[in-house]
Amino acid sequence: MDPVVIFLVLAFPIASVYLLFYHKKRVGGLSSPPGPRGLPFIGNFFQLYKAPCIHEYLWNLSKKYGSLMTLHMGSVPILVVSSPKMAKEVLKTQDLIYCSRPRMTGMRKLSYDGLDVAFSTYSEHWRHVRKLCTLELFTQKRAQLCFRLVHEQEVSRMIVRLSETAAASKDVNAFECFSNLSTSIISRVAFGKRYDEDGIGKERLQRMLSEIDAMLAGIFVSDFFPMFGWIDRLSGMRARLDRTFKEMDMFYEELIDEHLKPNRPESPTEDLIDVMLKNKGSSCLLTMDSIKAILLNVFNGGTGTSATLLVWAMTALMRNQGVMKKAQEDIRRVIGRKGNVDEDDIQNLSYLRAVVKETMRLYPTGPLLIPRETMESSIIGEDKDHMYMIKPKTLVYVSMWAIGRDPEIWKNPMEFVPERFLERPDLNYKGQQFEYIPFGAGRRICAGIHLGVTTVELALANLLYTFDWEPPAGTRFEDIDDETLNGLTLQKKNALYIRPKKYICP
């Protein structure tokens, strides 16, 4: 049974008692930012739970309450940030106060109690792991020596499979196609194997990744109402989390054991497990559990986001045929009869790169950045007449969904217009300009930006160079929607099916 339903049934009598006897006292000094009124004890829990899409719901609320908005999930205060100015305050000016992470049940369990880089609280261990990621795992040198070869080989394999599909006049499930690509790339980069070959079961891996995503995004009653934590066990959520962790731990344990075998065949390039095992001997902070936790970040962060971004890019292009045609003409003009696009070509494809940037603006893979948690009290506000007090242990969500749709920042924000990024070539995703931070900013900016963006740019360039694209038989371009689902990543509600048609270069 749904744990939230159980909780609401049990909490209703308590909320009723609060309504009879609870009286809010006026507190001197600065107040919290405004926000929708919630029920005593429960707060805004029910409102958030019943929202079809939380990012849409919070965006609409921000239009009423402003760029700083307060909600409550039980006793836990939540701050929603919806403007570049306030995002800069949180992610840069006061980053040291706002740079920790909440200890949410799903994230804590699957990250081996916060031994990773994405979900860990701010600590000496996090600083060490972050340094490992930036100086060893995701360096420019490694990108050239290892990542490039993998990218180009796996994109080429995808194009071959799609050519067979085109010859048979069949439709393609875009997410399945792009998920296969990104999972193959990440698995080769991380542990030196293609996920659907070499004995690694495709079905097992996809099932595990799906469960991990569900548990990371899942609502655990104990996170917001500790006294009702037993509901997580009664509902089966805790048992499901434990099963997911056990399966994940076994999977990563097998991979690490293979790398530790003395008779393991030598590879011309190191994968990420090789690098971490080498660094493990020189640091007491890097344990086997730390390595597994980092693999969680690399695998779940790298596979789902790249595939999702490619789906949204193709969705936007199918819905905007003029943009599709312009992108194809530009790519085919630059590449000519070469036969494929490689990484060296990407720098010369300015319109393609603008398409990817515009996709990340209108359809950010993380509509709400991974929540932060304040480590101490903070004073923040748009101006001196609107200053607010933010309490310690406040959950902080920066809404990329709201910022990317703000008409005061973007002209015609609901339209897909890559040209806006050609007019501002300085606008990038490296966390410097706070009207556009799809990968976050500050200490917590994504460490694997280059790996993810290169995957998307190279794949999309080859998709547009090699094929023309049509909707399935019996449907029109106008039938393709852009409805979204709830979740940590911005998933498309209705699967995108498209039909490739091989382009013959004149």
Swiss-Prot record:
Its main location: membrane. Heme binds at residue 446. Induction: Accumulates in roots after wounding. CDD domains: CYP71-like. Pathway: Secondary metabolite biosynthesis. The chain crosses the membrane at residues 3-23. PROSITE patterns: CYTOCHROME_P450. Its EC number is 1.14.14.-. SUPFAM superfamilies: Cytochrome P450. Signal peptide: none annotated. It is found in: Microsome membrane. Keywords: Endoplasmic reticulum, Heme, Iron, Membrane, Metal-binding, Microsome, Monooxygenase, Oxidoreductase, Transmembrane, Transmembrane helix. It catalyses: xanthotoxin + reduced [NADPH--hemoprotein reductase] + O2 = 5-hydroxyxanthotoxin + oxidized [NADPH--hemoprotein reductase] + H2O + 2 H(+). The keyword Heme applies. Residues 365-370 are annotated as: Substrate specificity. One of its GO terms (cellular component) is membrane. It is a single-pass membrane protein. Pfam families: p450. It is an enzyme of class 1 (oxidoreductase). One of its GO terms (biological process) is coumarin biosynthetic process. GO terms for molecular function: heme binding; iron ion binding; monooxygenase activity; oxidoreductase activity, acting on paired donors, with incorporation or reduction of molecular oxygen. The keyword Lipid biosynthesis does not apply. Involved in the biosynthesis of coumarins and furanocoumarins (FCs), natural products required for defense responses against attacks by predators with potential medical and agroindustrial usages such as anticoagulant, rodenticide and artificial vanilla substitutes. Catalyzes the conversion of xanthotoxin into 5-hydroxyxanthotoxin. Belongs to the cytochrome P450 family. PANTHER family: CYTOCHROME P450 83B1-LIKE, CYTOCHROME P450 FAMILY 71 PROTEIN. This is 5-OH-xanthotoxin synthase. It comes from Pastinaca sativa. The gene is CYP71AZ6.
